[in-house]
Amino acid sequence: MSSRKQASQTRGQQSAEEDNFKKPTRSNMQRSKMRGAASGKKSAGSQPKNLDPALPGRWGGRSAENPPSGSVRKTRKNKQKAPGNGDGGSTSEVPQPPRKKRARADPTVESEEAFKSRMEVKVKIPEELKPWLVEDWDLVTRQKQLFQLPAKKNVDAILEEYANCKKSQGNVDNKEYAVNEVVGGIKEYFNVMLGTQLLYKFERPQYAEILLAHPDAPMSQIYGAPHLLRLFVRIGAMLAYTPLDEKSLALLLGYLHDFLKYLAKNSASLFTASDYKVASADYHRKAL
């Protein structure tokens, strides 16, 4: 009887130790289920009837310094790591799980694969507009000409005309919401990115003059079509940092491509070399 009791106690102790060893895996699975449920709630709200309820604050934010947490990609990464906590068969390895748990304590850190996949967001420029991008570059960097500011038709006016054009094609509330979100987002991106990413070096003294002359005006009220087109060469890299899932991002890209088609269709009136002028000798000295 004594030997049976000891054997029973030994088996109970081994079972308890084994359960303790596997607890990190079970708890991690519980967390993964909770994250999966949260992700499901988010995707459930993403309906194609409008731009997407998952795009608050104009496409869900733009800061590269604040990567989204709790994304689908990161949940998968955690699930892949979880089985490692239960590998091995010796109870002497019990202290190891806490070390592994601390290694992944920051849920906001993206995997290298997830980061690279986000860098692949590309906005396709219509073939009709590519020659103008080249001419714009040549006029400014080689011929040393400047786009005349304020523009005859500024970015705000172009976006407003596009919105009116789309709304006139069908008075659907969801469609109107989508157009307003797209136009508002393009305008915000333009105003944020112009001074740091959309200007050639030769244009910077002109930009400084504009800031002095119009300190309270958004740049979308000053600049025109050429600089707006430059935005779409750069915007893909910025979209890589938005917390949008693949479905929402694909929907957004569809709207951006539709706007680019509008620019291409109206390129004859929006893009012309006569809107540039040769910079003065005094300006050349400033630009050196």
UniProtKB/Swiss-Prot annotation:
The modification Phosphoserine is found at S71. GO terms for biological process: chromatin organization; DNA repair; positive regulation of DNA-templated transcription; positive regulation of double-strand break repair via homologous recombination; regulation of apoptotic process; regulation of cell cycle; regulation of double-strand break repair. Gene3D superfamilies: MRG domain (1.10.274.30). Keywords: Chromatin regulator, DNA damage, DNA repair, Growth regulation, Nucleus, Phosphoprotein, Transcription, Transcription regulation. It is found in: Nucleus. GO terms for cellular component: NuA4 histone acetyltransferase complex; nucleolus; nucleoplasm; nucleosome; plasma membrane. Residues 1-15 have a biased composition (Polar residues). InterPro entries: MRG (IPR008676), MRG_C_sf (IPR038217), MRG_dom (IPR026541). Residues 1-115 are annotated as: Disordered. Residues 117-288 form the MRG domain. Component of the NuA4 histone acetyltransferase complex which is involved in transcriptional activation of select genes principally by acetylation of nucleosomal histone H4 and H2A. This modification may both alter nucleosome - DNA interactions and promote interaction of the modified histones with other proteins which positively regulate transcription. This complex may be required for the activation of transcriptional programs associated with oncogene and proto-oncogene mediated growth induction, tumor suppressor mediated growth arrest and replicative senescence, apoptosis, and DNA repair. Component of the NuA4 histone acetyltransferase complex which contains the catalytic subunit KAT5/TIP60 and the subunits EP400, TRRAP/PAF400, BRD8/SMAP, EPC1, DMAP1/DNMAP1, RUVBL1/TIP49, RUVBL2, ING3, actin, ACTL6A/BAF53A, MORF4L1/MRG15, MORF4L2/MRGX, MRGBP, YEATS4/GAS41 and VPS72/YL1. The NuA4 complex interacts with MYC and the adenovirus E1A protein. MORF4L1 may also participate in the formation of NuA4 related complexes which lack the KAT5/TIP60 catalytic subunit, but which include the SWI/SNF related protein SRCAP. This is Mortality factor 4-like protein 2. It comes from Mus musculus. The lineage of its organism: Eukaryota, Metazoa, Chordata, Craniata, Vertebrata. The gene is Morf4l2.
